[in-house]
């Protein structure tokens, strides 16, 4: 790709969703404007998924690329125009007759995603077993939840080098090898079935859930098992509770069909969120979302949110950073060798801290320098000096003394408090 095409592509990426309102900050945000290398809005610091941006096509491309060159190609289709793989997301529309006084109206419910099973009743049953606030009904809280989890769990920059910021040719090659490896060894999609339907494993054979994976027995030998025994032999791999007969379960092929999960228990072992669209990564007996699987394999830059493929990076405040991305969260100035303050787990340079985040002294009404001692009570702060931490009535210095706080004032005695009341 030549330089002009690269610049054009980057420009289009930054134009996507430009000006969209923030659903979290409301009117405090002037509208979405993508930061040059951080994956956040320059105005409010929230992610794109927190803004009212239509991303369905972009997300379908992202998931389509994830499934490319895997056994899950049946879940994608390539556009004739550009050959880009698109996720064939299964949308489920349910129509329920609603009786009115004079006639019958039709109530339609659209799920933006549903398990790709032929039995719609099974898919509907699966949805009903999810928390209502996480059911992806179009226009609902659940649809917004799914949108956020697609962005959080499956970052495009964890699989596509073109979505990353200034990778070297060596880093691009390493990333491509990493993606190929996790597609071959960890990536999977959950399968929704009734546990009893998973018994058949080959002609005249029945699989025993919970036993050795190679254990089989003749069908005839199982026919005398009681219904009660069949119910108790199935338990959720996550919560360990028994599965109710007739309820759908989720299987993960990479985990083996001796393990199954309740729909609401099919979650990432790190963030404990529902695995979006049942897309999972399996490692050492645990389910992960894409983000946290990658975090278990590679360091992630706390500045740009990308995986680090360089041998040289810095560690600070229990986080990892590209050398060029250990910058002030407010002004983007590089912090190497500079004084900084952590604000909400983000490093901020001293000038920006004093300007934007510092507490204001109730005595002199100036910002309190981060390196200066202070006195704090509730939400009020003072310089710990003889000029600032004084009785609000008689100006007696209160450092090391007992005091009586009243909102933003402090008093040395009851008498002084009464005189000011």
Swiss-Prot record:
Residues 133-164, 193-213 are annotated as: Disordered. It is found in: Cytoplasm; Cell junction, Focal adhesion. Residues 155-164 have a biased composition (Basic and acidic residues). One of its GO terms (cellular component) is cytoplasm. GO terms for biological process: negative regulation of cell population proliferation. Residues 234-297, 299-359, 362-421 form the LIM zinc-binding domain. One of its GO terms (molecular function) is zinc ion binding. Keywords: Cell junction, Cytoplasm, LIM domain, Metal-binding, Repeat, Zinc. Residues 92-199 form the PET domain. Pfam families: LIM, PET. Scaffold protein that may play a role in cell adhesion, cell spreading and in the reorganization of the actin cytoskeleton. Plays a role in the regulation of cell proliferation. May act as a tumor suppressor. The N-terminal and the C-terminal halves of the protein can associate with each other, thereby hindering interactions with ZYX. Interacts via LIM domain 1 with ZYX. Interacts (via LIM domain 3) with ENAH and VASP. Interacts with ALKBH4, talin, actin, alpha-actinin, GRIP1 and PXN. Interacts (via LIM domain 2) with ACTL7A (via N-terminus). Heterodimer with ACTL7A; the heterodimer interacts with ENAH to form a heterotrimer. Belongs to the prickle / espinas / testin family. This is Testin. The lineage of its organism: Eukaryota, Metazoa, Chordata, Craniata, Vertebrata.
